[in-house]
């Protein structure tokens, strides 16, 4: 049975785009990687919460737009348990809104870009060096084009 399960937790009811947009991004990334079964948890948090998480795990004491935590199977856990679990994503919608405004981008398009970026991190992509960054950015551009979204790395005019 094929299934993609996106668990969105938004306890404080932060403004987010229609969840269908996020599910469409999830399906697109999974399909691109020939994955038919997957699960991801997404927590929508305040700037203060993401700043605390960013400080604790990345040693950067400032809010950020998204943080991805790739699932690492604990030793001894049977292979079939959590076999399709990619990990957890934490998103700060206030940061995304500010970035979209500053970069003159459509807010829903920016959400989709950053969410795809976070999903790719869960699949092991990174941007630590220039080669990895170029590979990840090119894949993001390709996936976003399939959604009808312009290249986010080209500066938008105000």
Swiss-Prot record:
Lineage: superkingdom: Bacteria
Lineage: Bacteria, Pseudomonadati, Pseudomonadota, Gammaproteobacteria, Thiotrichales
Gene3D superfamilies on file: Metalloproteases ('zincins'), catalytic domain
Role summary: Single strand-specific metallo-endoribonuclease involved in late-stage 70S ribosome quality control and in maturation of the 3' terminus of the 16S rRNA.
Family membership: Belongs to the endoribonuclease YbeY family.
Protein name per UniProt: Endoribonuclease YbeY
Cofactor note (record): Binds 1 zinc ion.
Stored HAMAP family: Endoribonucl_YbeY
Matches recorded under Pfam families: YbeY
Keyword Hydrolase belongs to the record: yes
GO cellular component annotations of the record: cytoplasm
Organism: Francisella philomiragia subsp. philomiragia (strain ATCC 25017 / CCUG 19701 / FSC 153 / O#319-036)
EC number: 3.1.-.-
PANTHER family documented for this protein: ENDORIBONUCLEASE YBEY, CHLOROPLASTIC (PTHR46986:SF1)
Listed GO biological process terms: rRNA processing
